[in-house]
């Protein structure tokens, strides 16, 4: 070992194998959240699907793997690497409204 960085190529299959356990945990979390979600909202989620965001959404086959495990349609966001930052920025623009709404409704999930 030289201690210097080096590049290594791995296949999509090798990447998915390495992600088996974290994907299992994510899918279990989806099931747990849906169990605690009001039925009408859970039905909407089941009908509309799960939108996957972030750079990990670009990994080949991750949408199919999550869909197989949850039984819910999975959609990759249009711009998965940027959409979380864009949404956060939009939320900050209306932060007063969001806080007021959360306080007025005493929303248990916020």
PLM region spans:
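Helical "lid/coupling" subdomains associated with nucleotide-phosphate turnover
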Residues: 1-110
């Amino acid at each position: 070992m030289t201690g210097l960085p080096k590049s290594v190529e791995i296949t999509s299959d090798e990447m998915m194998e390495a992600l088996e356990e974290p994907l299992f945990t994510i899918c279990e979390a989806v099931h747990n959240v849906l169990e605690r979600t009001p039925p009408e909202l859970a039905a909407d989620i089941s009908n509309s699907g799960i939108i996957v965001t972030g750079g990990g959404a670009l990994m080949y086959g991750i949408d199919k793997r999550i869909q197989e495990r949850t039984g819910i349609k999975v959609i990759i966001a249009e711009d998965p690497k940027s959409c979380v930052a864009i949404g956060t920025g939009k939320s900050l623009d209306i932060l007063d409204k969001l806080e007021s709404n959360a306080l007025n409704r005493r929303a248990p999930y916020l």
